[in-house]
Each structure stands twice: as C-alpha cells, then as structure tokens.
Amino acid sequence: MREKRLDIQGLRALAVGLVVIYHLWPGRLSGGYIGVDIFFVISGFLITSHLVREVDRTGTVSLGKFWARRIRRLLPAAFTVLVFSLVAALIILPKSLVRQAVFEIGASALYLQNWVLAGNSVDYLAADNKPSIVQHFWTLSVEEQFYIFWPVLIVVAIWVARKLGRNASSPRRAVAIALVAVGIISFLWSVYATATDPSSAYFITPTRVWEFVIGGLLVFVRSWDQVTLGERSRDRVRLIGGWMGVALILVAAAFFNEDTPFPGYAALLPVVGAALLLYFGRSDLAWSPGSISRFAPIQVLGDISYAVYLWHWPLIVLYPYVFGSDFVVLGGLAILVVSVVLGLLTKKFIEDPARYPRERLNRTSVAFAFMMAGVLVLTGASGATTLKIDADQRAVALRAAALQEGGSCYGAAVMDEANDCEDPFLVTSTVDPAFAADDRYWEKGIRSQDTCSRQPVTEVSPDARCQYGDVDSPAMTIALVGDSHAEHLIDPLVTYAETHNWRVVVFSLSGCTGLETTDDFEQPLSSGQAECVAWGAETQAEIMARNDIDVVLYSNRPSGKVASSEHAVDVWDEVRASGKTVLAMRNVPELPSNETAPECIEASDDSYDPCAWTPDDDSDFMLDAAGDSSSPTPVVDISDYLCSEDRCHMVIGGLIVYFDDNHLSYTFAQSLSPYLGAAIEKALE
C-alpha cells in the first residue's frame, strides 16, 4: 500500500472548510465556492496517478476494475445522503418544493445534476428558485463524469500510440499529450462560455475538465526532491511555493464573489494554488503548509471531507423548515457540528466497510450490481413521486378550467366590481401550493416554445423576432421591452392582442431592463452587466429604426436594478422622437419577505385571504421616470386587480397570484388579460 499523502488530506480539509463556511455564511467568505475547484485538482492528480501507474505496470487500464473502485469509494455515502434527502423532502419540505427536490434527487442518482442546474440557470429566474436539497451534487456529477471519461481517454490514447508504432515509452507520452490537448480545449471553452453564457458555464463539465487536467499533469512533472539543487535551496523554494499556493487560494476565497466571472480565467487562481500545494506541499519543514496539515484535527477533517460535503447542504436547506426561521451564528455552528458528526459516522460505518469489503464482495460485478440497484431505487422513487405530483397538478388545472367556464368569478375577474363576486379571496380546491410553485410562464406559456426573445438583438432579424397576435395586418404593433417582469406579461398581452388585431413584438432579457448604461455599474463590468448594457443599446437602436412599431411598453422589476430614472427619460425621449408612443408598466407588488406565495399559503391556517400584506412604498425608477415633469410618460397600472384598498392578496378568485415572491403565476396572469389590455388602451387615450 502506498504511503498516505498527509498534505493532500490537509488540502481536502481546506477545500471542504471553504465550501461549508461559504454556504453557511456567504457574506463572511464570498469566494468560498472555489473549494470545489481545489477538489477537482486533487481528483485529477490522484486519479491520473493511479491510472498512469497501472499503465506503467500493465500497459493499459482495466476500465471495469477502475470504475468498480470508484463505485465502492463514492456511491455508498452518496446514496445514503440521497435516500435521507428523499425521505426528508417528502416529510419536511413544503409541498411546493417537493417536485423540484425529488426530480433533482433522481438526476443526482444518475450524476446528471450539473446539467439540470445548467439548464435551469439559463434564466436568472431559475436561480431565484429555492435551492434544492441536493443542489450540491452538481460537483459530484462533474467528478463522476470525469471518472467515466478519463480512463476511456487514456485507453484510446494508448491504442493510438500503438497503432502509430511508437516505442515502449509511448503509452505514458500518449497519455500526457492527450491530457494537454483536452486541457487546452477545455480551458478555451471555459473562457468563452464564461463570457457568453456565465450561468450555465459554471455547472457544465467541459468548462471544468481543465482543472482536473492541471492536477493530472503534475504526475508527469519530475518530483521536486529530484531537482538538481542543494538541499537548502530546494527547501527554500518548496516553502515559498507552498505558501504561494495557500496565498492564491485565500485571495480567491476572500475577494471573489457572485459577480466574479467564473470559472474562466478567474479559476486559474485557486487551481494554480492547489497545484502548487500538491507539488510543494509534501514537506516536513517547520511551518510549511505540509507540516501544518499534519495536525490531527486537520487530518480528521480531510478524512471525512467527502462525507461532510455530502451532509452539510441538506442540513442547511432543511434547517428553516424544521426550526421555523433562518439560522444565524448558533444555528450555523450547530449545522457545522452535526455535519462533522455525521461525516465521522458515515466514514466509519458506510465508507470504510464499502471500500474494504470482504473478499466475496470485493468483485467488480458486485460493485456494478450495487450501483444499478441504488440508481433504480432512487430514480424509481423519484419518478413515481414526480408522476404523482404531476397527476395532482393536472387535477388542479382541470378544476381551475371548470371554475373559469362556470362563470365570471375567476382569477382577476373577481376584482372587477361589475362581476359582483362573493368571497374573492377564499381558499378553494384550486388553491394548491404545489400547482402554483410550478405554474411558471417559461414552462407553460409562449416562452416555453421559443427562445427568440432571449437572443441578442443583433443575432435576430426583425422578421424572425418573437411576434404574436395579428402579425399580417395589425391595427397596432406594440413592443414589449424589459426583464422577467415583461416576460410574465407576454401571454396575457398576446391573448388580448389576438382578439383586438394587435401585433406584439417581444424584446426581453431576464435581469436586464434595457435601460442600463455603463455608468450605472461599478467598474469593471461583469459579463452579465456588460450583456445588459449591450442588449439595451441594441434593443433601442432596433426599435427606433423600425417604422412598423407604434407603441413601446417597458416593464421591469425595479428591485435590485441600477438603471437610473434620468437615463430612462433620455431613452424614452429618443424613442418618442422616432415616432413611437412610450408607456411604462407599474410593477406588480412584491411579497414582503423571501418566502414564496406557495410556501406562505401552505403554512397558513387561514381559509380566507391568507398571507395578505400591506405593500411597501419602495422607490421605482420606472415610475420616477414616468413622472418627469418635463417629459411625462403614461403608466399602465393593473394594481387594482392585485390589491384592494391598502392590502394586496396572494389568493384571488381561486388562484394563487404568484409562483414565487414577485412573478405572477401563469394561470393568474392569463386571467389578467382583458384588464391588462384595457389598461394599455386607457394609457393610450
């Protein structure tokens, strides 16, 4: 058995410590997420070391035996946490979150969680969703995909070398060349994807492979002990190199944040730092990183780092539902302690017995059988639960349709005094939190069928842009411009347009108002901020150049936006100068807390008007711009169909109004259609 690298255990302890502290207290360590990059470098080094030794010894790699070892090492603990998460989701989580949780548990069992999150993260709205109980499995998915891909690449590289008739040393050389080639491609992809699609770039495997490669290439670098230098010089360089690695990691952890374009170039800091520690860290020198990592507590944390990583996130997600409030210092410390205790128990009773089984169980076939059984159980349970929830939601949708057909007292129509509806805020059988949580316009509405509204303006010709309603001979063409608060109005606006001979042209990009300028942001701009500025300028240019657009309706969420009312006035004046009428949409009232409407209603015992609230009179740059005395802009206001007197409502006409804390549910938004259209016509008078 090879000697255990104590410095690697220390590096693992550092990595898991960074991640856990970041998840518990992100404001204290804004870049702690780089801990996962350290894990990737370690994995690349260790796995490549093992595979290259096997190549040196046998001339090839036994894929079955390699994968069996990975199964025994990783899956028992992972499956344990997934089973726990499944049971906890069904018992503890609100019904509105169960479907997302069980679906992602199934994806995690298949080690596809990173691709699920990448798909969801295309839209910042998806990031607004409550994080699932197994969201952290994205990193394990990347690792497992690497473990599948890496040995296959090595086998192919060896086969190619032999076909080319190289000498006996060529297998090792072929592996090194393959690593370099794949690493370069992956790094370039990472840089490009981080600049062009940063949300999904964070999760997908191709943007992360180069981090494994950096670790793997260390296997082919001559050991520092073999470098031709005097012992004192070697020790001095080793000490400096090790602490440089620590410094790079700590700088990234301290100064990176959610606005740092990542991975891309920025990931070089923690990746190179981890590589330096792996290369120079194996040292007994006093006060070297390697010697410090020999302390028993650090070694223990390194030993249980995998299990601690698995357990800490479900505990973080479950805490507020168990204790009724978000955790602060003491709650965070309790999660930390429980994670360590569970990590110790998991290693002793699950990981170690699985890694070192009895002889009759130490077979490749047994490992694969265990994997298949675990995957089938978890995906089967996940799939069955998802199907049950979907069936329940279809039943709710049918009841809602029946309610709509049964009369005028449905959805927003109950707020119309002409309908004289009784009990407008009553909780009925159609008020279902689980249904509302999934009642999202991007999954049910027009936006689920196309992507043209989300593409850069310069990449979409005017004829190909999202156009709806009467596209051939419209009486009026209205351009809808803005962020996700424009997008949740697309379907009700188009429904009205179809019966009034309007054409609707959509310019939308979630998170961007179309009114930002470079000066609105701190410099330098992040990739997302630069995208907003460019998209806004392109949108304005196209709208002004088009003679077929009559009205431009801007709809945005003011919360968290940096756009100024002064610049909005300037933009609107320029658009008006090109012959268009400009309208500003008053934002829908937002919930007073981060709790979603489905969650609040599920937790409420009120059968009438649950979770109603008095809205805050927050500043709104759109309304400020519309009220400019020198250049006023008409306002489209539908708040009378969301609020009565000084109270706003989460249940109206048998429907839950929001699917989260600020976006209208698809079904309720559709019920607003006639009133949205009427409000636009009133603003045009």
What are these regions (language model features)?
Residues M1-T379, I656-Y658:
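Membrane-interface helix/loop caps of multi-pass membrane proteins
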Residues E258, F323-L330, V340-V341, K348, ...:
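Extracellular/periplasmic envelope-modification machinery, especially enzymes
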